[in-house]
Amino acid sequence: MRKYLLSAAAVTALLAGSTTAMADEAAAQRWIDQEFQPSTLSKDEQLAEMQWFISAAEPYSGMEINVLSEGIPTHSYESEVLTKAFEEITGIKVNHQILGEGEVVQAVQTQMQTGRNLYDAYVND
């Protein structure tokens, strides 16, 4: 369940974004079978949810987004595992950088002060 919740949260958070990938229902099924178990949802319910993500991401397929997170184990899992799942399922490539908490804050401040888009999303727990 934890893996499923993390995957759903990551996919939802990353759909905001800003170049090379293809959405794939077969990939969604592979991830459901091999990584997103156990889950409180049945595999059919999970696939229905993944189909929604594939459809929602369709206009953005082939895009590439940059995400910054602080260095904690949850974010390492997101960076190492869920970014691959996200790209295979949605067609959106995620460049996920992990830095220390202070560096994340500094990056956010820099982006706000300069108006220069450094990252498309920030993940902070």
Locations of the language-model features?
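Gram-negative bacterial Sec-dependent N-terminal signal peptides
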Residues: M1-A23
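Short, polar/charged alpha-helical segment
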Residues: E49-A56, P73-K93
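Short N-terminal micro-motifs specific to bacterial/archaeal maturation
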Residues: L14, Q37-T40, D44, N95, ...
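Immediate post-signal peptide segment of exported/extracytoplasmic ligand-binding proteins
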Residues: A23-V67, E87-E88
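Generic structural signal for beta-strand residues in well-ordered domains
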Residues: S7, A16, E58-Y60, E87, ...
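A common structural microfeature
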Residues: G62-E64, G91-V94, L118-Y119
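Ligand-binding clamshell of periplasmic/extracellular solute-binding protein-like
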Residues: S69-S79, H96-D125
